[in-house]
Amino acid sequence: MIYKDSEDIVKSTLKRPVKHGDIVTVGQLSLEVFHTPGHYPDSVCYLLDDILFTGDTLFVGRTGRTVSSGSDTRQLYHSVYNIILDLPGNIIIYPGHDYGPKMTISIDENISLSPLLQAEDVDDFIHQMAKYENERTFEN
């Protein structure tokens, strides 16, 4: 599954364009699609019951980074604060890969762990992201 705006650049005949709000059925499972740009313009998350597969949008302890071509910190703020953090706090996130102290975490627990999820507004988030990048080491 790929976000609909990336359909022309994905070189495969095995693709299914999706958009925000779509329900994708895989066998007996139904996943809701959330378009969550910021890390990349075509980033998506998938909600399955009380599990959110966040890809590179949200990790345990932090958000995705916005240092690549096409990344946008303001878009990431909107995706995280107006989409993901609006979900029930007991939702468990499953990131695309492991960068945190554990593999999965609830939204509420992640908020308490990460300054990036405690920003007062978009400007504070941008400041927190810049601070994270400036203090970043190979380990984090």
Descriptions of predicted regions:
Residues 30, 41-139:
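Metallo-beta-lactamase
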